[in-house]
């Protein structure tokens, strides 16, 4: 959740 690939946007990251 910090901007990695396949991560769900929850803390300010985002999916790629």
From Swiss-Prot:
Conversion of fibrinogen to fibrin is triggered by thrombin, which cleaves fibrinopeptides A and B from alpha and beta chains, and thus exposes the N-terminal polymerization sites responsible for the formation of the soft clot. The soft clot is converted into the hard clot by factor XIIIA which catalyzes the epsilon-(gamma-glutamyl)lysine cross-linking between gamma chains (stronger) and between alpha chains (weaker) of different monomers. GO terms for cellular component: extracellular region. Its main location: secreted. It is found in: Secreted. The keyword Disulfide bond applies. One of its GO terms (biological process) is innate immune response. Keywords: Adaptive immunity, Blood coagulation, Coiled coil, Disulfide bond, Hemostasis, Immunity, Innate immunity, Secreted. It comes from the Eukaryota. A long coiled coil structure formed by 3 polypeptide chains connects the central nodule to the C-terminal domains (distal nodules). The long C-terminal ends of the alpha chains fold back, contributing a fourth strand to the coiled coil structure. Heterohexamer; disulfide linked. Contains 2 sets of 3 non-identical chains (alpha, beta and gamma). The 2 heterotrimers are in head to head conformation with the N-termini in a small central domain. Cleaved by the protease thrombin to yield monomers which, together with fibrinogen beta (FGB) and fibrinogen gamma (FGG), polymerize to form an insoluble fibrin matrix. Fibrin has a major function in hemostasis as one of the primary components of blood clots. In addition, functions during the early stages of wound repair to stabilize the lesion and guide cell migration during re-epithelialization. Was originally thought to be essential for platelet aggregation, based on in vitro studies using anticoagulated blood. This is Fibrinogen alpha chain. It comes from Ursus arctos.
């Amino acid at each position: 959740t910090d901007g990695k690939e396949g991560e769900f946007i929850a803390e300010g990251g985002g999916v790629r």
